[in-house]
Amino acid sequence: MVEIHDSRMDRGAGAVRLQKILSRAGIASRRAAEKLIIEGRVEVDGQLVRELGTRVDPDVSVVRVDGVKVVVDDSLVYLALNKPRGMYSTMSDDRGRPCVGDLIERRVRGNKKLFHVGRLDADTEGLILLTNDGELAHRLMHPSHEVSKTYLATVKGAVPRGLGKKLSVGLELDDGPAHVDDFAVVDAIPGKTLVRLTLHEGRKRIVRRLLTAAGFPVEMLVRTDIGAVSLGDQRPGCLRALLRDEIRQLYKEVGL
């Protein structure tokens, strides 16, 4: 790692002090940001920076703290939506069916073009991420980054003890093998079982097809997590901005 001590590294019109950038991005207070710089935990364009007087143009340079990219562009939008059951994941629908675009149009200003991360079937409820950060969206959706997704599924029948192991080993589906990374029984009532499962792929209807292949058709399905972002107590139809820490964790998961 190259280390620099030149406070004149950027004299551009948009250059501001590095600690101010970190503070504005919500990384730390101004004083705590200064400590991060002195400790050698901050990089600018791949170079370690330790001088507090360093000025950087956040629109040009890439700033990282502990190897994780700092998001400083105020025009970028990061949203979490709990898509209701019966709603389509598209931004528009030529047949007039209810879709995610209907919610976005009413609640997001500025006509921003948003990318979906993690589309869901109309009959599945749960977490969808929406952002105009194209690079992050692309990486989150690309199979090579293996971003985990967690679901709660209500299935027919009583689930036997060995089902989790069976799903972890994997089953052969029409489009190839599939397996879960984690599986647990959450609750059970006569004739039905609530299970939680985590997997890192996003093939169409993969959870429903996998559980059906195992002999347990899905009655209801909710996605609760995508990577570091959780649905929590967010109700169907509710839209919220991601926390800065959630954004940082997503960046870390995909190597940005």
Curated annotation (Swiss-Prot):
It catalyses: a uridine in RNA = a pseudouridine in RNA. The keyword RNA-binding applies. One of its GO terms (biological process) is enzyme-directed rRNA pseudouridine synthesis. Its EC number is 5.4.99.-. The active site is at residue 121. It holds the Pfam family PseudoU_synth_2. SMART domains: S4 (SM00363). One of its GO terms (molecular function) is RNA binding. SUPFAM superfamilies: Alpha-L RNA-binding motif, Pseudouridine synthase. Residues 16-83 form the S4 RNA-binding domain. This is Uncharacterized RNA pseudouridine synthase ML1370. It comes from Mycobacterium leprae (strain TN).
